[in-house]
């Protein structure tokens, strides 16, 4: 499964100034299964309430580019220590429709054991889907939306959709 990730760029698109960054945390569990960490945002959040998302957010002073933002946010939201993170590269920046933010997805392998500590304020739930399931085109569905297909994935009774679904599909070569 790690071989499927070889297409990841080593740098973000030149000239793009990201307004946000997310960490796409990937790890191998103790059974040798490759998984991803996703979170569900609480319904009380002012933006993206109830959405399934990667840890991430807007830059703050002192962040060292998109990687610094993604690492800080992942630590704040789910307790991933920066020392556990091996950045593999970047996906193309994603322009979110709802807030027109340019988001840089930072893809990283996370060292285990993974001892997550979700922020009660920012995380309602943590998911650990297997990459092999997310990479299965048969498990995805779509609805026509404007000029595009809005892809979605059933994730333990919740729906992975929108920009996060687009990032997952880009990562796994499904787009």
Placement of each model-derived feature along the sequence:
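Amphipathic alpha-helical blocks and their helix-capping loop/short-beta junctions
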Residues: 118-145
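N-terminal leader/linker segments that precede catalytic domains of diphosphate-processing enzymes
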Residues: 1-54, 58-113, 123, 143, ...
């Amino acid at each position: 499964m790690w071989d499927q990730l070889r297409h990841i760029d080593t740098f973000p698109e030149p000239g793009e100034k990201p307004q946000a960054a997310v960490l796409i945390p990937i790890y191998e569990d103790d059974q040798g299964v490759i998984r991803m960490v996703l979170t569900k945002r609480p319904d009380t959040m002012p933006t993206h309430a109830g959405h399934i998302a990667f840890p991430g957010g807007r830059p703050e002073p002192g962040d060292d580019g998109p990687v610094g933002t993604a690492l800080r946010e992942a630590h704040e939201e789910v307790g991933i220590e920066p020392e556990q993170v091996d950045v593999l590269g970047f996906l193309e920046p994603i322009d979110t429709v709802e807030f027109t933010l340019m988001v840089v997805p930072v893809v990283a392998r996370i060292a285990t054991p993974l001892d997550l500590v979700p922020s009660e304020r920012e995380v309602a739930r943590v998911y650990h889907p297997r990459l092999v399931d997310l990479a299965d085109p048969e498990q995805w569905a779509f609805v026509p939306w404007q000029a595009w297909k809005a892809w979605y994935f059933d994730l333990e009774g919740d729906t992975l959709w929108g920009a996060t679904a687009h990032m997952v599909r880009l990562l796994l070569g499904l787009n």
